Amino acid sequence: MIASKESNSAATPATSAPTLRTTAEIAATAAMGHAPHETFTINLGPQHPAAHGVLRVLMRMDGEWVENAEPVIGYIHRMHEKMGENRTWAKFLPNTSRIDYLSAMHYTHAWVGVVERGLKIEVPERAEYIRVITSELNRIASHQVWWGALLLDLGGFTPILYAFDDREKILDLLEGLCGARLTYCYYRFGGLYNDADDDFLKGTREFVKYMRPRLKMYRDLVTDNVILRQRLTGIGPISADTCRKYGATGPVIRGSGVAYDVRRAEPYSVYPKLQFKIPTYPECDSMARYLVRMDEMEESLNIIEQCLDLIQPGPFMAPKVPRVIRLPAGDYTYAVEAARGRFMVRVVSDGKENPYRARLRTPSFGNLSLFEETSRGMLLPDALAMMGSLDLVIPDIDR
């Protein structure tokens, strides 16, 4: 049974609902007074701090009110899918760490997972536990970047210093494990590049103990701050139907009350053996999406701790993995729950050394797609706060 965390309405200060202008209200305003009604267009990006990357949003404004906001993408399109079709299965592995560079472990997991499914490779249990540990560490590190950047958008500078300081501890752990701090490429078909030593496992356990009181401090100093709640509560409402309409997943749809998580809906690795909750909030606003991610960091710590207790000595690679990968002709899919939502790999194989077709379904594209509809009638600062709550990574959109 899927568990969910109910929102604590008593802890939320009473705030007045934000004013959203409908098309009719905008037209009525235009008819008032003697001056002719004029709108103007501004470009948010493609180089703007609030865009968090090379994203351009063409915004038609009526004063401070957003009449329409059209995302313009493609500035860093790198043809990952086409490269996947022109490279061997193994040579495409480094690409997976560079699609969503903040969630690299999850993306590599999906690529090796689809190959292992096609070749019916049984991954050793120890390798699966290490994959889950590193994936959840990567999820926390990604949420740290989102948390600090969102508060920076809202005018708070200090929290991002705390976030990056704590994230640095995760990067140090992963660097000691695989030698990289961002684009890891640590997983291999059938297992891992190398085994996790005792120093990594001990350091990870110490990090879990360190991070729990830090998250409580985040909640006391930031989450319960009345200014933050006034900036996010009631801002950017996104209904569950709108999420489904545009294919939004991850914390965005869970912030709209839908307890959809790939780790439960499409179980993979050793997640079925682990106990964890799926945080959901029914309010559908930016504050709900904020709370989902804060709760997810706590759940990731619980998952990591369970894996550390359950992991046993053993091999970290499957004994028989073909040196030359050739998937049997067919259509294969594999999905994971990345930091921003559902990432799915779909490949069509014709039995050769490279895929006939490679399809990468990334979460950020669906999460951005709903911005144009949901931002209409909002004040510009509120629209930027809502965009920050979507946690966009631009290379994940353009691919």
UniProtKB/Swiss-Prot annotation:
Topology in membrane: Peripheral membrane protein
Main location: membrane
Record-listed E.C. numbers: 7.1.1.-
Primary enzyme class: translocase
GO MF annotation, one: quinone binding
Keyword annotations of the record: Cell inner membrane, Cell membrane, Membrane, NAD, Quinone, Translocase, Transport, Ubiquinone
Subcellular location: Cell inner membrane
Quaternary organization: NDH-1 is composed of 14 different subunits. Subunits NuoB, C, D, E, F, and G constitute the peripheral sector of the complex.
Functional note: NDH-1 shuttles electrons from NADH, via FMN and iron-sulfur (Fe-S) centers, to quinones in the respiratory chain. The immediate electron acceptor for the enzyme in this species is believed to be ubiquinone. Couples the redox reaction to proton translocation (for every two electrons transferred, four hydrogen ions are translocated across the cytoplasmic membrane), and thus conserves the redox energy in a proton gradient.
Family: Belongs to the complex I 49 kDa subunit family.
Protein name, per record: NADH-quinone oxidoreductase subunit D 2
Organism in which the protein naturally occurs: Opitutus terrae (strain DSM 11246 / JCM 15787 / PB90-1)
UniProt lineage: Bacteria, Pseudomonadati, Verrucomicrobiota, Opitutia, Opitutales
Gene, per the UniProt record: nuoD2
